[in-house]
Amino acid sequence: MKKRVVISGLGFITSIGNNTPDVLASLREARSGIEIFPELPQEPGYPRVAGTVKGFSFPSTTFDDWTWPPEYTIERTQLRSMCPHVVYAFCAMQQAIAQARLGPERVSHPRTGAMCASGGSMWMIYEHLHVMVTRGVHKCYPLALPAAIPGTLNSNLAADFKLKGAVLGFASACASSAHAFGYGYDQISQDRQDVSFIVGAEDCNLHSILPFTGVRALSLVADPGKTPAPFDAKRDGFVGTGGAAVVVLESLDSAQARGADIIAEVLGWGEAADGYNVMAPEPEGEGLARAMSSALAAAGVTPDEVDYINAHATGTVAGDLSEIKAIRRVFNGTRVPQVSSTKALTGHGLCLAGAMEAAFTALALKNRFMPISAKISQLDPACVGVPVLTKPVGEEPVVAISNSSGFGGANVSLVLKRWE
């Protein structure tokens, strides 16, 4: 028999808050974390804004120059193999462990692991390759490689928190940490682990954001109050962000035995590939529709039981429309759930997005509200028939879906339920 899986802790370093109370307030009040980002070229034809991470500074690749909020202690021996997003994740992990009330013996246990996702640090890779090319490989920092590669997240967290269970890294572009969440759920529901930390993280700097200008994916709107605008008729692309989110998944048996404060239950998940294009989403939303249908079947939930969808919608014309069509496919002939994209507030966190938005969805369920889709001045007519939330409603959601999609047509849907 499958074990029931719950969420017992959350940790946030995000553009809309660096702790659960601040993130919750931002979601309730539609408080945006988008700002003018001086690292980006402040001239026409370039993105100028980002979902900035406050309270941290990384002026160079020399870790002695880095600063972070004073409530966190990070030893020099730990910093040596880190990059910015690992620092974010280290802090978010401490929050999640504290909220879940996990002691050291439970964290460092053979049945406690972590499922992680990041794109690595393009900034660290660039800077250290520059040293190798201009000065020679023997002038390179010895720990440059483990500090920069995508596996830096899981390897650092495993070492620093003495994790002894299953620790994996995932790479499916912007669906990565949603995949991590799904496979973490499987580890627990199949009784292979008792606890799994789901971690999504990304740098927030020029090197992690600007390259998407080359594929015409980024918004060029210079007003942080107007972009990104998922589902808006005049949306022009996504806005980059970074940070970290940690979700503690735990078996219900383990959480109840410890007297944990349960945030939400995870009912199941689904995944599917578009099989269409290395970058563009399948126009009719067929792959995402299959992921949602698979998730609902695994969760034992019918479409008309779903109250809310936290959409992947990033603010691109093609991506948002594909998701709307996917929702229509799945909820054809039934009550269509309320839909919103919290990326209007945070920006798009790439490999961070899935874990971050699943955590947002869990918070919304626990606190009985649905975040709105902000910055919509005129709803895209293509969304007609799908109730995109542009203002708060009194309905209290019980069952919700969190969607994620990535380059190459990777699609993941997670089904969560309010804990009663």
What are these regions (language model features)?
Residues 7, 28-172, 201-209, 303-319:
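Conserved beta-ketoacyl condensing-enzyme motif
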Residues 134-141, 182, 186, 190, ...:
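Glycine-/small-residue-rich "gating" segment that lines the acyl/pantetheine channel
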Residues 15-17, 21-22, 73-91, 140-149, ...:
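Active-site pocket-shaping loop/turn-to-helix segments
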Residues 4-8, 31-36, 46, 223-299, ...:
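Condensing-enzyme catalytic core mediating Claisen C-C bond formation in acyl metabolism
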Residues 38, 43, 192-236, 269-283, ...:
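Acyl-CoA/ACP chain-elongation machinery
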Residues 9, 27, 93, 114, ...:
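Conserved small-residue
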Residues 89-102, 150-153, 158-161, 166-201, ...:
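Active-site-proximal alpha-helical scaffold in enzymes
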Residues 1-75, 253-265, 359-373, 417-420:
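ACP-dependent fatty acid/polyketide chain-elongation machinery
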